[in-house]
Curated annotation (Swiss-Prot):
It is found in: Cell membrane. PANTHER family: DIHYDROOROTATE DEHYDROGENASE (QUINONE), MITOCHONDRIAL, DIHYDROOROTATE DEHYDROGENASE (QUINONE), MITOCHONDRIAL-RELATED. Its cofactor is FMN. Keywords: Cell membrane, Flavoprotein, FMN, Membrane, Oxidoreductase, Pyrimidine biosynthesis. HAMAP family: DHO_dh_type2. This is Dihydroorotate dehydrogenase (quinone). The gene is pyrD. Catalyzes the conversion of dihydroorotate to orotate with quinone as electron acceptor. One of its GO terms (cellular component) is plasma membrane. GO terms for molecular function: dihydroorotate dehydrogenase (quinone) activity. The active site is at S175 (nucleophile). CDD domains: DHOD_2_like (cd04738). Substrate binds at K66, N111, R112, M113, G114, F115, N172, N177, N246, T247.
Length: 336
């Protein structure tokens, strides 16, 4: 496979520049016959989750295609699902650059992107043009300048706009790069948000005559007490699924490595064990009443199987995809 050569060239570039260049090329081919260049045949291995049938258990995690620009090209690589976003009601530039860093020796990434995106209306227009035949998840968040106490309004605005076009909606309350966002994971703030989201979901179901499941994406840095509380809230509010996990603030496994001191969320292999442990504990708390989508450091078939053994129904990749490329998709789907 050609990817090791592509990676070598891309890794000569600044990480965000490499991402932009790759997406430039994918945008050129998406929806054209040139998509054949990235198309991979993978076996069909249907999995039912949140009332939806996924053609295979592997998805692309949110954050790579924030604006839904390359849905068809990414879909052609063999993913059973794509989660686009995180998208916010209004466009925003995100944090200052540089804001994305490779930890090459650890096969990890640190990002402090800050929900840079072109806004929900732009994403919806891109989704309308796409022909992906898998499940499309749309991950939503709040604008940086929206006060946390009004944060739920941003989620409701996005829900309303994406509902008709989403296979499922992911609620991102766990990015470490939007000030105060993670406080929405706790106590009354979480209950208040989930009540509003569930009410909005019911209203939108009546309007659109279809039920779009909602999953909440959580952080890996929850203590035992917080994790029990989150699981309890998700069950009480009849949320449809949970995505575990987002990036970590923990640097214990990357001490002394180049870029390890950068602020932001750490993903990739250093997150693998931590996210798997959260999935295992969540699974014990949820007792099969709510499905888990496992994400965090999956870079091999074994790592994907570990997430499923811990209690995940579906798995997603992001950093592993950056380091291993499209062959990782085929490998995981074939052998999982």
């Amino acid at each position: 496979m050609y990817y090791p050569f592509v990676r070598k060239a891309l890794f000569q570039l600044d990480p965000e520049r490499a991402h932009e260049f790759t997406f430039q090329q994918l945008r050129r081919i998406t929806g054209t016959p040139l998509e054949a260049l990235v198309r991979q045949k993978v076996p069909t291995k249907p999995v039912t989750c949140m009332g939806l049938t996924f053609k295979n258990p592997l998805g692309l995690a949110a954050g790579l295609d924030k604006d839904g620009e390359c849905i068809d090209a990414l879909g052609a690589m063999g993913f059973g699902s794509l989660e686009i976003g995180t998208v916010t009601p209004r466009p925003q530039p995100g944090n200052d650059k540089p804001r994305l860093f490779r930890l090459v020796d650890a096969e990890g990434l640190i990002n402090r992107m800050g929900f840079n995106n072109l806004g929900v209306d732009n994403l919806v227009e891109n989704v309308k043009k796409a022909h992906f035949d898998g499940i499309l998840g749309i991950n939503i968040g709040k604008n940086k300048d929206t006060p946390v106490e009004n944060g739920k309004d941003d989620y409701l605005i996005c829900m309303e706009k994406v509902y008709a076009y989403a296979g499922y909606i992911a609620i991102n309350i766990s990015s470490p790069n939007t000030p105060g966002l993670r406080t929405l994971q706790y106590g009354d703030a979480l209950d208040d948000l989930l009540t509003a989201i569930k009410n909005k979901q019911n209203d939108l179901q009546a309007i659109h005559h279809k039920y779009v499941p909602v999953a909440v994406k959580i952080a890996p840095d929850l203590c035992e007490e917080e994790l029990i509380q989150v699981a309890d809230s998700l069950l009480r509010h009849n949320i449809d699924g949970v995505i575990a996990t987002n990036t970590t603030l923990d640097r214990s496994l990357v001490q002394g490595m180049k870029n390890c001191q950068q602020t932001g969320g750490l993903s990739g292999r250093p997150l693998q064990l931590k996210s798997t442990e959260i999935i295992r504990r969540l699974s014990q708390e949820l007792k099969g009443q709510l499905p888990i989508i496992g994400v965090g450091g999956i870079d091999s078939v074994i790592a994907a199987r570990e997430k499923i053994a811990a209690g995940a129904t579906l798995v997603q990749i992001y950093s592993g995809f950056i380091f291993k490329g499209p062959p990782l998709i085929e490998e995981i789907v074939t052998h999982i």
